[in-house]
Design a protein with these regions (language model features):
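Short coil/turn segments at secondary-structure boundaries
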Residues: 24-26, 66
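Short, amphipathic alpha-helical interaction segments positioned at domain boundaries
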Residues: 77-87
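A short, conserved structural fragment
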Residues: 53-66
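Minor-groove-contacting beta-hairpin "wing" of winged helix-turn-helix DNA-binding domains
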Residues: 68-74
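Short alpha-helical segments that sit at the start of domains
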Residues: 1-22
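Short, hydrophobic-biased segments on the C-terminal half of alpha helices
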Residues: 45-53
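Acidic, low-complexity, intrinsically disordered interaction modules
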Residues: 39-41, 49, 65
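Short helix-coil junctions and helix-kink-helix linkers
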Residues: 28-45
Length: 87
């Protein structure tokens, strides 16, 4: 599966319901939204984890350690770029 499609699924799963700024969710909740043929394979899981890290490093996702788990949310300062990517 192409990386841009997986990035789109990650971002869309955080847009609805809205997870901008201080409203965040666990990474495992994002992984639940993927088709089974991707999320059940080790290669698919590694690719999802890699692309989440890429989005964090690009500044599109904010990360926070909460309740012992890593939580992420969309960066509200990058909203224009995120919405442009999704169109």
């Amino acid at each position: 599966m192409e990386a841009n499609i997986i990035k789109r699924i990650i971002l869309e799963s955080l847009i609805t319901p809205p997870r901008w700024g201080s409203k965040h969710t666990e990474i495992r909740n994002i992984k639940k939204g993927f088709p089974l043929h991707i999320s059940s394979s080790k290669e698919g899981q590694k690719l999802i984890d890699k692309l989440i890290k890429v989005l964090i490093n690009d500044g599109w996702l904010l990360c926070k350690k909460s309740t012992g788990e890593l939580h992420v949310s969309l960066n509200p300062h990058m909203k224009k770029e995120i919405m442009k990517f999704l169109k």
